[in-house]
Amino acid sequence: KYQYQTPIGAPAYAVGALTVLGMIGGLYGMFIPHATVKASGEELPLIPVDPAKKQVDWDHYGNDAGGSRFVALDQINRNNVSKLKEAWRFRTGDFTTGTGNGAEDQMTPLQVGNKVFLCTPHNNIFALDADSGKQLWKAEVNSKADAWERCRGVAYFDSTKALTQPTLAGATPVTAVATNTQCPRRVYTNTPDGRLIAVNADTGERCKDFGVNGTVDLLEGLGDGTKAPRFEVTSAPTIAGTSIVVGSRIADNVGADMPGGVIRAY
């Protein structure tokens, strides 16, 4: 005796049709203008910065050693930020090579005193006058990599400044360093081709007493297969006390023998 049975594909087609309709509706909604959502509640007043805590430098990638990313200044605020005008512009002459895997300018500069320190996609370092934007010195590094050429920032260290000791109970004290060196103030950069370089923050010259003539080979001891883009260093070095902490970027799905990620301090 024949008995009609619902084809197995019918429910699947129905679910598929509903899914497609939902996707079309979501795509359509992306292009519909939405009303501005305003914050509710009372607007908080602007609180003046305590003159004793007024910040004068941005000497770490994230502003301070703790990476707070917020600056204790109130000269520019929500009431006057719309009136800002460009004071100066500086061109490094180091060209990018397009988006994607090429050279890109992704740098966050540092400001220490009246100097601004910045780096180019090929790790050339510049010191500029903060008021005029004029070049004070240039340290040529000219790093090269097959892909992912970028310098996201530099690190600054002044051995003549008093060290900030940790306040956490049981923490290891920060070890003091010599102050009578060739470079009492230094700027550090790490490159995509695996180098950590130190230059004199006052002159831009290599610090010969660091590593080998101012350079540490970050590929040493990592084994084979470390050529960029397998192993690269693009993020700014981190100054932790008197140590320079360096990370790494490992490419995905390039080979079966990829190098391991490594974090080191010098």
Per-region residue spans from a language model:
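Repeat-blade elements of multi-bladed beta-propeller folds
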Residues: W58-G62, N101-N124, W148-R195, P229-A256, ...
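Aromatic (tryptophan-biased) beta-strands that constitute blades/sheets of beta-rich domains
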Residues: A39-G100, K134-S143, Q165-P166, G170-T175, ...
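Membrane-embedded alpha-helical segments of integral membrane proteins
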Residues: K1-Q3
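Aromatic-anchored glycine-rich loop motif in surface-exposed flexible loops
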Residues: A127-L128, Q135
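An acidic- and aromatic-residue-enriched active-site/binding cleft used to recognize and process polar
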Residues: P121-N123, A130, E140-V141, P192-D193, ...
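Internal/C-terminal transmembrane anchor helices
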Residues: Q5-P33
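Short, acidic, Ser/Thr-enriched surface-loop or helix-capping motifs
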Residues: V81, Q111, D129-A130, T191, ...
